[in-house]
């Protein structure tokens, strides 16, 4: 009995030694699974990747490039557009961006989609996006739009006067959309065209984004 007890005690001591040794190796390697990843600067409510130790299943990240409009969605009779390759996660922000230019290269539509943490983050994200518009346009008074949630349109010329600029901002679910229409100076995009393109993008987001957690 004394020999069996001594054997069990030796085994326990060995397990403790090995466990402490493994923990020591983790510390030496610099791995610290208890700290989150560094946050990425972004708009308020914009998702940023972090590490987690939760055992709950994690939803796959959304591929926003497949939710962007294509050239055929913007083209009209007698005015065909061509899309450049889409950019995933521009400026390290979850989302996507694409530039669509007409064949005469006199008009362009650029679409930026940015993921939000939740629909509740929409108002603050819209406010921040609207505040930054002066970098690309000398806007007139903002006008409400029927597109999405919080839809707002501003129109004017670029700061250098080289082109007309109309920007539509709105949110749809957990995403912010910024749709910019560029054209010749003094010839802003037609209001119906802006609304039509915006509604198509809102529908693409509504259909393609996963339902918020807790939604049946």
Name the predicted role of every residue range:
Residues 2-13:
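Bacterial N-terminal signal peptides that target proteins for export
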Residues 96-126:
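A short acidic-to-branched-hydrophobic micro-motif
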Residues 26-98, 191-198, 202-216:
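N-terminal "mature-domain start" segment
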Residues 110-112, 174-183:
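Short, well-ordered beta-strand elements
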Residues 179-196:
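A short acidic/glycine-rich loop-to-helix N-cap element
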Residues 20-24:
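C-terminal motif of bacterial Sec signal peptides marking the signal peptidase cleavage site
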Residues 95-102, 164-172:
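Short, surface-exposed beta-strand/loop micro-motifs that present aromatic residues
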Residues 75-89, 123-168, 203-216:
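Short Gly/Thr-rich strand-loop-strand
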